[in-house]
Amino acid sequence: MGRFPRALKRELGMGQPPQVAAVCYRANGSSVEFLLVNTSSGKWTFPKGRLEAALSASESAAAEAWEEAGARGTIEGEPFGFYLDTKRSLGVSETVREIIIAAYLMDVHSAVVPQESGRNPSWFAPQEAKRRLGESRASKYSETLHKIVDAATQRISNAPSIAYPSKQHSMAHLR
């Protein structure tokens, strides 16, 4: 189930593939931090983007983490949640549409300066990440992002010390 299920896309009324996000985290002592990046409009978000044809959904999310945040690590093979956001489409007239994003948890092992400039990747504790993600967003969208941070924090705190290899992908082959 690495690709977004077509039946779910139809059920949600989505005519095009959804976006995928890498919810990047690192352990910082007994706490956890999340890696956020800036959008072109200055909002904070998780590294995200469209599905890439040659990659699975989780690999596409990991590729976004690399391109936007310079992060490499181990990403889970299945989404742990979904959230809503908006996407601006520029053309003859500017339109804003709602999109559903599949969220993949990624344990970051290393981070360097990203390929994309202007992203300003930064680490935040869960409460600060929620505050930053909520800035300049309607409450409907900030609430879904807050739930993703809460779900990720809960999942990380309950994770066994040994990963599930069949459910995770190493990013070594995407270098």
Residue ranges and their predicted role:
Residues 1-29:
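Acidic, metal-coordinating catalytic segment for phosphate/diphosphate chemistry
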Residues 28-33, 92-96:
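Short, solvent-exposed loop/turn segments that connect beta-strands within catalytic domains
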Residues 35-38:
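Short, acidic/hydrophobic/Gly-rich beta-strand patch recurrent on exposed beta strands
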Residues 45-49:
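A short gly/proline-enriched turn/hairpin at secondary-structure junctions
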Residues 51-141, 173-175:
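Unchanged
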Residues 136-175:
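Charged phosphate-binding loop/patch that engages nucleotide di/tri-phosphates or the phosphate backbone
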